[in-house]
Structure formats: structure tokens, C-alpha cells
Curated annotation (Swiss-Prot):
Residues 52-95 are annotated as: Disordered. It comes from the Archaea. The gene is rpl19e. It comes from Methanothermobacter thermautotrophicus (strain ATCC 29096 / DSM 1053 / JCM 10044 / NBRC 100330 / Delta H). Part of the 50S ribosomal subunit. GO terms for cellular component: cytosolic large ribosomal subunit. GO terms for molecular function: large ribosomal subunit rRNA binding; structural constituent of ribosome. This is Large ribosomal subunit protein eL19. Belongs to the eukaryotic ribosomal protein eL19 family.
């Protein structure tokens, strides 16, 4: 049974594409007899003809990728785009380092490992970028007899 006319009319009435028209398989004879717009409208009202929902974009793949990233996957060298300084700016690295150094210096001063003048000297050196880590700073202080 050819239902192209009915599908075309229904698509026009429902303002959807022809491929989104669904016809009840149990009422095909009834639908085939409807050859006017009014007949098709009546069938739509009765529920013999309906518009299928839009397909949309599946979120399965994006969810799967997000799950993998949560587990720490997809972080290999092939996934890295941008320079080293773009992924973690130099300023951020500097801030992390200097905060650690200053915190360590305060602890050393409060625990009386160093005196105020030594604290100030090491503080200024840290600010100038003389130490790249806490261990370097402690080694420097030990080697130059700055510790009490």
C-alpha cells in the first residue's frame, strides 16, 4: 500500500520532515483512504499519524571521554597542545615556589632556627630567585652557617 501522499500531507500539517512521520501499522487501511488534508488532520487527532521526536546529538561519546579523563586517561604527549608555559604559566609556577619558600622561612624564624637578620637576607634572596626549592634554600643556609 502506497502512503506517500498521506505522509507528505501529514508532514506539511505537522511541520516536520517526511521521514519523521509515523503511521500506526494497525490502521494502515484507514490511513490509505484519507486523501484530503482534512482526512489526514482527523487521523492525526485520532493518533493514527504522529510525528516522531527529533534525534538530536548523542552525548554517549562525550560522557565516555569525560569518564576516561576523570580516571586520568588521555594525558599522553599526543594530547598536549600548547607550549609548556601555556599549560602552566611561569607566574603560577613562581607563585607556588615563592609561597612555599616564604612559609618555610617563617617556620624557621618562628622555631628559632634562624634570626631576624638571616630571615630578611634569605627572604630577599628568595624574592630575587636565588632558590628553586625549599631544599636548595635549606642547603644554602646550612652551607653558609646561617642556622643557629
Amino acid at each position: 500500500m502506497n502512503l506517500t501522499t498521506q505522509k507528505r500531507l501529514a508532514a506539511d500539517i505537522l511541520k516536520v520532515g517526511v521521514n519523521r512521520i509515523w503511521i500506526d501499522p494497525e490502521r494502515i487501511d484507514e490511513v490509505s483512504r484519507a486523501i484530503t488534508r482534512d482526512g489526514v488532520k482527523q487521523l492525526i487527532k485520532d493518533g493514527a499519524i504522529k510525528a516522531k521526536p527529533k534525534k538530536g546529538i548523542s552525548s554517549y561519546r562525550s560522557k565516555k571521554i569525560a569518564q576516561q579523563k576523570k580516571k586520568g586517561r588521555r594525558r599522553g604527549p599526543g594530547s598536549i597542545k600548547g607550549a609548556k608555559g601555556a599549560r602552566r604559566p611561569k607566574k603560577d609556577e613562581w607563585m607556588t615556589t615563592i609561597r612555599a619558600l616564604r612559609k618555610d622561612l617563617k617556620e624557621m624564624r618562628d622555631n628559632r632556627e634562624i634570626n631576624k637578620s638571616t630571615y630578611r637576607k634569605l627572604y630577599k634572596m628568595a624574592k630575587g630567585g636565588a632558590f628553586k626549592s625549599k631544599s636548595y634554600m635549606k642547603t644554602y643556609a646550612r652551607d653558609h652557617d646561617m642556622l643557629r
